[in-house]
Amino acid sequence: MPWRTALKVALAAGEAVAKALTRAVRDEIKQTQQAAARHAASTGQSASETRENANSNAKLGISLEESLQILNVKTPLNREEVEKHYEHLFNINDKSKGGTLYLQSKVFRAKERIDEEFGRIELKEEKKKEENAKTE
């Protein structure tokens, strides 16, 4: 008899925990979706653009914002300005001039990330041109 009561109590407790966990997961998913929508609205990016940006950040190990800060450039991006700042910082941080390989690597990675962004911008412009050509 006591085992039966203990089993009922354990099952009731397990059921309550399962319901609470399910509700918490549902709430977390809803909040994540709302946060993604707010981020997309504030940046003006679609969900796929945000995903592409996150993939680029993960692949290269550096965010676009960090890259812009390292090379001291602002948006909208200008290739000549980026190249000028990159050359200057890369040469200044040369080991023979008292720089370090670490800093040169950071400058190189920042340029690499910005180049990736230039590629995405060009791809977007090409798609836009193709769509305009199809509609005409």
UniProtKB/Swiss-Prot annotation:
Segments of this protein annotated with the region J-like: 66-119
One Pfam family matching this protein: Pam16
Biological process, per Gene Ontology: protein import into mitochondrial matrix
General function of this protein: Regulates ATP-dependent protein translocation into the mitochondrial matrix.
Domain note: The J-like region, although related to the J domain does not have co-chaperone activity.
Subunit structure: Probable component of the PAM complex at least composed of a mitochondrial HSP70 protein, GrpE, tim-44, tim-16 and dnj-21/tim-14. Associates with the TIM23 complex.
Protein name, UniProt field: Mitochondrial import inner membrane translocase subunit tim-16
Source species of the chain: Caenorhabditis elegans
